[in-house]
Each structure stands twice: as structure tokens, then as C-alpha cells.
Design a protein with these regions (language model features):
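Extracellular/periplasmic bilobal clamshell ligand-binding domains
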Residues: 313-346
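Bacterial lipoprotein signal-peptidase II cleavage site
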Residues: 19-39
């Protein structure tokens, strides 16, 4: 879900930024020096290393790297991260010619890439998820949408607390609202799914048009930007990822979150292993299993939604209106909903 790229060998790295857009590439290794990085790359040939492409945020990269490093794979893989749209485009265009041996990516993109290119292997390890998933995917994270509010600004400006997304069409929020453009961030798709599911496409477009009008210049390209703007006191209301708002509130910031009555829709990111025939890197399947078996505890500390049997969710992190869109989430549906969003723009 980010635009930056990182290169990691061995121990986990943390990227230079956490936004979903435009960052400078960064590389680190376990010894934190460029000389050591070059030495590590030289001593371990690229043929032996598993190349992992990912759209994940910093926290997820950290958790996955920790799982691999702590279970014998230090120095045996390379992580490279991309924005969701960029990596999705590579999957669809390149198929099995992709340089990567393994990807972690928005599941809806993986589905479309598999249908178009038949590029992923069936996983050879047990994936005991709470809900049925394609046999070539194992989910690593689930992220829900919610309304985010700055409690101090609401009070200072006598603004009502919204209870649903349709409330955001009220002109009282003009100049106080930030949302994300679905053309640049899949986070915004959570808002689109909720509106379309509740009101149908035509009314959803009308509602979205009024929301965009109230947001004005704050139709952001980054999914985390509305929360950041709320934290900085630049806007009073935003739409973003629920777990990030929960964390901000727990840190003592004047941030709260509202589960919209239209529903808390979610997107998952999953791991998949590329099928390259005789050139398939066998260690990629081992690493995929390692991430799921040894990384989920840390992953769930950042992305609390339960995905696997035996996992639980505390009351704070349990949304009030969890819902699933009526149609299967695919890149093609994402494109269609982007068209609705474009038509709604001023």
C-alpha cells in the first residue's frame, strides 16, 4: 500500500516513510552499513535469494522480516516494496516473467492476476483461515475502514459527530473533511464499497460528489493522509484505516473513530508463490509458510482482525458493522468503482 521501494537483506528494515505515496528508495541490512550490504549481496548469489515483492506497510514488512530472520532465513531473501497500483500493474503485465519469487499483495489483485496469467502455485502448507480463500493465497493482514475525528476540533467548531458516511455530505463539514482518492489508494475503496453496498451505484455517486465538494483540496492520494491531517489539527473529520485510528487514540492523541452505519468493509493482503516451472525457487514456499506460521502474532499486533482459526479480537478492535461486499473483489471491480469516483469529482 505504499509508493516507496526498499531493499532488505537479512534483518528487518523500516522504510523512510509510512505514507501510501511518493517516497525515496531506501536500503538497509543487519549491519547497517553500505559496505556490509554489498558484501552480503556478493556472498549470497541472487539465484539463492528469494525475491519478495510487496505492497505492505512498514509494520507488516517488519513483522514478516522478523519471522524470517528468527527462523533461519536471515540473508536469504530480498524485500522490495511498491505502491499497490504499481505492483498490481506489474503482476497483470508481467505474469510469471516477474522477477519476484513470492509476493505479498492486495488479495483482489492476486485473484485477477491468477485468472489472467495463471501465475501462482497452490500452497503446499495448511492455511486454516476463518473464511475460505483461494488455494494459492494465505492472508497476512485485514484492514477495515472507519470515520476518523479530531475530538478537539469538533468541539471547537461546534461540529456534530457523524454517525454514517452520508452525514459527511452536510455542508457543515465543508473545509473540515479529508478523504482519499480511490485512483491512487485502495484505502478509499473501503468507503466506495460501503456507499455502493448501502445506496446503489447511482445514489452512491451523488453522495460521493457532495463528500468530495466538502473535502475540497483534501482529496488525498495517500490512504493515511486523512488521519495525519486529523492528528495535525488541519481537518476535523476524515476517512481511513480503523486500526490506525485506534492506535492514535491509544497514544493519547485527540483522535476518535466512528464505525459508519453503512458498514466497516475490509481488504486483505495475502502471500502467494510464483510458478516459474523449473526456475521456481523452492525456498519461496518455505518462506511463505514461515511468514504465516511465525509472523501472524506480530502482524496481528498491528492489524488486529482475526484471520485464522484460534485467533481472537478484543472489543476495542472489533468494529460495530463488519460487512462484505456482495460481489467478489477483483481488479476489474476496483476499476469500475474508480470510474464512479471519477464521475463524482467536481
Amino acid at each position: 500500500m505504499k509508493r516507496n521501494r526498499i531493499l532488505a537483506l537479512g534483518l528487518t528494515m523500516i522504510t523512510a516513510c509510512s505514507l501510501l505515496s511518493g517516497c525515496t528508495s531506501t536500503s538497509t541490512d543487519s549491519s547497517a552499513s553500505s559496505e556490509s550490504t554489498e558484501a552480503a549481496a556478493t556472498s549470497t548469489s541472487s539465484d539463492e535469494q528469494v525475491v519478495i515483492y510487496s505492497n505492505a506497510d512498514d509494520e507488516a514488512i517488519t513483522a514478516m522480516s522478523n519471522a524470517l530472520d528468527n527462523n533461519g532465513y536471515e540473508g536469504k531473501y530480498i524485500f522490495e516494496t511498491f505502491g499497490t497500483s504499481e505492483l498490481g500493474g506489474k503482476l497483470l503485465a508481467e505474469g510469471t516473467n516477474l522477477e519476484a519469487d513470492m509476493v505479498t499483495m492486495s488479495t483482489f489483485y492476486l485473484k485477477s492476476a491468477q485468472e489472467q496469467n495463471n501465475m501462482f502455485l497452490s500452497l503446499t502448507f495448511d492455511v486454516d483461515t476463518l473464511e475460505e480463500v483461494p488455494d494459492y493465497t494465505a492472508p497476512i493482514t485485514s484492514q477495515e475502514g472507519a470515520i476518523i475525528i479530531n475530538t478537539e476540533l469538533l468541539e471547537e467548531n461546534n461540529l456534530p459527530t457523524p454517525t454514517c458516511l452520508k452525514d459527511l455530505t452536510d455542508s457543515v463539514y465543508a473545509g473540515y473533511l479529508a478523504v482519499t482518492d480511490v485512483k491512487s489508494s485502495s484505502t478509499a475503496w473501503l468507503l466506495l464499497q460501503a456507499l455502493i453496498s448501502e445506496y446503489g451505484e447511482d445514489e452512491a455517486q451523488e453522495i460521493l460528489s457532495k463528500i468530495y465538494e466538502n473535502a475540497g483540496d483534501h482529496i488525498e492520494s495517500s490512504g493515511s493522509a486523512p488521519l495525519k491531517l486529523c492528528e495535525d489539527g488541519e481537518v476535523a473529520v476524515g476517512f481511513g484505516l480503523r486500526h490506525q485510528a485506534v492506535a492514535a487514540k491509544e497514544e493519547g492523541l485527540p483522535i476518535d473513530y466512528v464505525d459508519p452505519t453503512e458498514g466497516n468493509f475490509s481488504l486483505t493482503e495475502s502471500v502467494a508463490v510464483l510458478d516459474k516451472g523449473d526456475d521456481t525457487n523452492e525456498m519461496a514456499m518455505e518462506m511463505a509458510e514461515c511468514i504465516i506460521k511465525n509472523g501472524r502474532e506480530e502482524l496481528q499486533s498491528y492489524y488486529p482482525n482475526a484471520l485464522y482459526e484460534g485467533e481472537s479480537l478484543d472489543s476495542t478492535n472489533k468494529s460495530a458493522y463488519p460487512k462484505t461486499f456482495s460481489e467478489d473483489l477483483t481488479f476489474e471491480l476496483y476499476e469500475h468503482h474508480q470510474e464512479i469516483s471519477e464521475a463524482a469529482k467536481p
